[in-house]
Swiss-Prot record:
Name the UniProt record assigns to this protein: UPF0358 protein BcerKBAB4_3775
UniProt cross-references to Gene3D superfamilies, sorted A to Z: SO2669-like (1.10.287.750)
Family affiliation: Belongs to the UPF0358 family.
Lineage per the UniProt record: Bacteria, Bacillati, Bacillota, Bacilli, Bacillales
Amino acid sequence: MASETVSNHQEKALALLQADAEKILRLIKVQMDNLTMPQCPLYEEVLDTQMFGLSREVDFAVRLGLIGEEQGKAMLGELERELSALHEAFTNKQQ
């Protein structure tokens, strides 16, 4: 019973983290579609704040043992790659 509860908590934690990551990914995709980052510094600030918040959530879940450290790193790494692609796309547009 206890292991079932732990497993349930782990699944819920992962689902919540993935939902938050998906929200950030949608923000990134909107920026990619519009490539308006410098015209909207507030949007970039929101992305940075959301990424920081998610990193804290992931750290907390890892410390509780709800997700593995590698799982958390992979989730954040994917979003960081998307952000990097956004910055690269905008830089290429400016050239």
